[in-house]
Amino acid sequence: MGGDNTLNDFRHIPRKRFGQHWLKDQGVLDQIVKAAELNPEDCVLEVGPGKGALTEKLIESQARFIQAIELDRDLVVGLKKRFSHQNKFSLREGDILSAPLDAENGLTINKVVANIPYNITGPLLKRLIGELRKAPDNCFETLVLLMQKEVAQRLLARPGTSNFSALSVRIQLLAKCQDVCDVPSKCFQPAPKVDSKVVMIKPFASIDPDFYEVGNLLEKLLKHAFAGRRKKLRNTIGSFVTSNDQIKEFFAYRGISLDQRPQEISPSNWFGLAKALKETCVIENGTFQSK
């Protein structure tokens, strides 16, 4: 069930344009389901079920209902045939970046499980978790995502480490991320060129009322600062800090130094800086100017 034999019996040549790499390792499949902490009230969205190895595990779990979305039409045919007898499973053909994310039986989806194609990781994270400037269309309580290890390390990175980036700031302001397990390339069929990692993401139930109001400014601030991640803050945003008393007070209060680099600043401090900037600065021609 869901292992090597199942994958081989389901005849389908992987398509590179869809980024198809099917997880075959039973241990990893079990860890994904365990991390989702499924109970009889849960309605799960599975992204890209492929040949159904993880789908079968989800159906066997305590989850109330599984709604899957698959883009590959040939796989859709095979999946419908394989799981046609399952009344707690429904399959929608479509692109996860644009398809409806609700369950076809009217239930509210509260959890997501996905083996993310590497080529759509960024856009999919935005759709499922939201953006600094825009709340997500659907609010999920837990997401268990299998993704490229390099990207996962950035989601999990702490300030001051080499992997901490603008993506780290964005995601950590929106959700709590937890490492589940590493997934070597040999766990897939066909094996990708890079390793993967499973991450559990729990979006915050409540967001600061000012969050989305300053989100656009925060995005521009992060882009501006992390474009020169090896540069000290005084060389990227120092000009408007030293000329703005309110921003200087914020730096002093939070213990931030212009000799620090962008990856050394915590997500909460980046948000606080954006709030202070919104009151005192505007962006003109890509640079920050005092009002």
Swiss-Prot record:
Keywords: Cytoplasm, Methyltransferase, RNA-binding, rRNA processing, S-adenosyl-L-methionine, Transferase. It comes from the Bacteria. It is an enzyme of class 2 (transferase). One of its GO terms (molecular function) is 16S rRNA (adenine(1518)-N(6)/adenine(1519)-N(6))-dimethyltransferase activity. GO terms for cellular component: cytosol. S-adenosyl-L-methionine binds at residues 21, 23, 48, 70, 95, 115. The gene is rsmA. It is found in: Cytoplasm. The keyword Glycosyltransferase does not apply. It comes from Prochlorococcus marinus (strain NATL2A). InterPro entries: KsgA/Erm (IPR001737), rRNA_Ade_diMease-like_C (IPR023165), rRNA_Ade_Mease_Trfase_CS (IPR020596), rRNA_Ade_methylase_Trfase_N (IPR020598), rRNA_adenine_dimethylase (IPR011530), SAM-dependent_MTases_sf (IPR029063). SUPFAM superfamilies: S-adenosyl-L-methionine-dependent methyltransferases. Specifically dimethylates two adjacent adenosines (A1518 and A1519) in the loop of a conserved hairpin near the 3'-end of 16S rRNA in the 30S particle. May play a critical role in biogenesis of 30S subunits. This is Ribosomal RNA small subunit methyltransferase A. Belongs to the class I-like SAM-binding methyltransferase superfamily. rRNA adenine N(6)-methyltransferase family. RsmA subfamily. It catalyses: adenosine(1518)/adenosine(1519) in 16S rRNA + 4 S-adenosyl-L-methionine = N(6)-dimethyladenosine(1518)/N(6)-dimethyladenosine(1519) in 16S rRNA + 4 S-adenosyl-L-homocysteine + 4 H(+). Its EC number is 2.1.1.182. The keyword S-adenosyl-L-methionine applies.
